[in-house]
Amino acid sequence: MLKMDTANNYDLESTNVLDITTMEMVSDSGKYIKRINVPATDQMPALCFELTGRKEKDDYNENLSRFFHYPDKLLITTDGIIIQQLDFDENDFSPCALDDFGFEYGDFRFDGYGGFKILCSSMGKNPVWKFWVWDENKKSFVNYPDLEMAGYINFDYNNQEINVSSSGGGDLHEFLTYKYDNDKLILIEKVIDADQDGKRKVFKLIDGELQLTETTESQLK
């Protein structure tokens, strides 16, 4: 059973990995280990994520000293007790320039329970993430494909909204805003800038349907 710390004031919001990691190299085939420690909250214990990755030199550009990284496994512990291990298949991931794979921990369903994400692909214009969220019944993290959409994802904890921005090439950009309704993600706003006619168009959820509510000059010209 997980031990919960109910006497702390830490708010579970997205936590960037760069402030809380340690790293060590292991001799096996260019593998390395990054450890990410996150504090306890009222609903989650303090956790240590031990991420094992493999790096290989980028042989396509001899002029750059650059490495690509692939995730191997993720070991999750609390108070030194293993609660879960995830084994990754390299074929499910594109080469990543980041050795931490953009790891981020946060309350991605705004329910007080933790979750984490890592990059699945960062090679194109829009990153793609894999998400896991805490399942209180299973006492483990489970894959959460509802959030696995292409684009840059930002969690607005004040408004409990999820904002996704993506580029379609050229001046075309799309900005999506989601909210949860009974644990289901609902698209409540869609902004296209610029559309084929060079306009910025705003669509909002009205009576269960996205409807065009505003058309202005593009802000990206």
Predicted regions mapped to residue ranges:
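Acidic, small-residue rich beta-repeat scaffolds with periodic aromatic anchors
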Residues: M1-F68, N158-K221
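Beta-propeller blade termini
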Residues: I36-N37, T52, A97-F108, A150-N163
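Residues in Ca2+-coordinating acidic/glycine-rich loops
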Residues: A40-Q43, G106-G114
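Structural motif
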Residues: P71, G124-F131, D171-T177
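Blade-edge motifs of beta-propeller repeat domains
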Residues: K73-A97, S140-G151, I162-N163, E189
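A short, structured loop/turn motif at beta-sheet edges
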Residues: R109-D111, D135-S140, N154-Y157, Y180-K184
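Hydrophobic beta-strand segments that make up the repeating blades of beta-propeller
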Residues: G115-S121
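A contiguous binding-surface segment within folded domains or other stable secondary-structure elements
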Residues: S121-N154
